[in-house]
Regions:
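Post-transcriptional modification and biogenesis factors for structured RNAs
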Residues: 1-118
Length: 118
């Protein structure tokens, strides 16, 4: 299993950041990087529950490029279905398909979320 880095781009709701940290801990992931995040208040730590350490140890950077500089693979997430002519390839995968694709990968993988309004 590769080392997985979760990258949050411009998170605006600190409670959501806490929920991400909690989910990360539940699945054994510990590396969180945030690009220009909101301030983390007590709400983030309440939502994180046992995963406050992930919030305390999170890397904060000012650019997306800086966030993924140490990653060999970068995977974006989206709930938006696009139509029309695009200049990139979007290949939707289920979580199971994504896990299967990572089998045998040893390099660091960034899984990118955000911004929350896109």
């Amino acid at each position: 299993m590769p080392q997985v880095k979760v990258v949050l781009v411009e998170p605006r709701v600190d409670g959501n950041v806490g929920a991400v940290a909690r989910s990360m801990a539940n699945f054994g992931f510990t590396e969180l990087c945030m690009v220009r995040p909101c301030e983390l208040t007590d709400e983030a730590f309440k939502r994180a529950k046992h995963a406050g350490y992930i919030l305390r140890e999170a890397q904060v950077v000012q650019s997306f490029e800086e966030a993924v500089a140490d990653c060999f693979h970068v995977v974006g997430t989206s709930g938006i279905v696009t139509a029309g002519e695009k200049h990139y390839i979007r290949i939707p995968l289920t979580p199971r398909e994504f896990a299967d694709r990572l089998e045998g990968v040893e390099e660091k993988v960034a899984v990118v979320f955000g911004p929350e309004d896109t």
